[in-house]
Amino acid sequence: MEFYEACGWLVGDEGDGVRQILRMGGLTRFDCALGSHALMRRAFSVALYHALQRQAFGKNLVEQPMMRQLLGQMALRLEGQTAFLFRLARAWDHRDDARESVWARLFTPAAKFAICKAGIPFVAEAMEVLGGIGYCEESELPRLYREMPVNSIWEGSGNIMCLDVMRVLSKQPAAMELLAAECAEVKGQNRHLDRAWRQLQQLLKRPAEEQGERDCPAGLSSWRGGADAAPCFAAAGRSLVPDDARHPRRHTS
């Protein structure tokens, strides 16, 4: 597309375009994480409704042990993500506070990296719950599956998010202090979170050239590995989510 004789207005200082864009980029990255989470919730709703109605071997699917375990794991992932995203939203709402500003700066790219990456296999799992019909357009899930990759790509792909997290940790000492304080507050409550924090500490002690840039956000976003890590989300969002919504912390050790 070409524009002839178009007129524009300079926003910010000349040569400072990237910095101006990045001021907006944090919110749009947060939006990507929220969008992926919403699509995952919709996929889970479709799968759960099907499991409640569909019968196999004399019982509804939801009553079959393996299906109950699968749906429970999917629900844990979603509850953990919800808690984390609420906590991140609070940080964005209170950016005038220095601590909350660092919280938003550090965890926004980590959230985009982890949640957007988790979306594609999550929807694929929901499709399997429905069986063959889950692959057909009538089920709605193929549309959700096609929609998923875009949130991982725009506003910065996975590598960009990883580099951004490393940049924050290396250039803002307050970010590492905040992360240590957050983990100390919930130490001993979940072994998966404790292990992820120990691994991340060891990673950051290595020389910069030995650090895997993608390892750091994966450690920071340790929930990325599966349902047993959902409490890592819940721990981050514990102060905003009421007790009856904190299923991950009660049911996963």
Question: What is each residue range found by the language model?
Answer:
Residues 1-199:
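Internal glycine-rich alpha/beta core junctions
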Residues 185-253:
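C-terminal amphipathic alpha-helical interaction region
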